From Swiss-Prot:
Homodimer. This is Ribosomal RNA large subunit methyltransferase H. InterPro entries: Alpha/beta_knot_MTases (IPR029028), RlmH-like (IPR003742), tRNA_m1G_MTases_N (IPR029026). Specifically methylates the pseudouridine at position 1915 (m3Psi1915) in 23S rRNA. The gene is rlmH. S-adenosyl-L-methionine binds at residues 76, 108, 127-132. One of its GO terms (molecular function) is rRNA (pseudouridine-N3-)-methyltransferase activity.
Amino acid sequence: MKIKIICVGKIKEKYLKDGIAEYQKRLSRFTQFEIIELADEKTPEKASQAENEKIMEKEANRILSKIGNRDYVIALAIEGKQYASEEFSQFITDITIQGFSDITFIIGGSLGLHSKIKQKAHALISFGRLTLPHQLMRLVLTEQIYRAFMIQEGSPYHK
């Protein structure tokens, strides 16, 4: 199995990089794991809705170029389905049972995801109604993917 996270924007904060690196290392015993960082578009301070739409579309085109034809695509979106950790673990298991060996998670930039990404996705998921910086969401998602594997293993990590 291969899991990748495609995300818009770079992480500058060392503490986030360190946390993500730790979970990447832990995940290596379960899966090939990759994070693909894509450049974000500069957003003018008082951008119009039309300008924001163009920015999201440019970012969407970059994202689409990194999605494999056989990937099961999961986009993170506020309107997505929410899961408890155990349910998320089962969701990952169910995807593999359906015959998918490559799972791709997508985290948008500061403006969110363009509709064409949401339409391409097999599933939309949400980690709650809170708004989190996309850099922090990357750490949260990486930890939850690791937790999903630990739940599948019956590990005491998840209590």
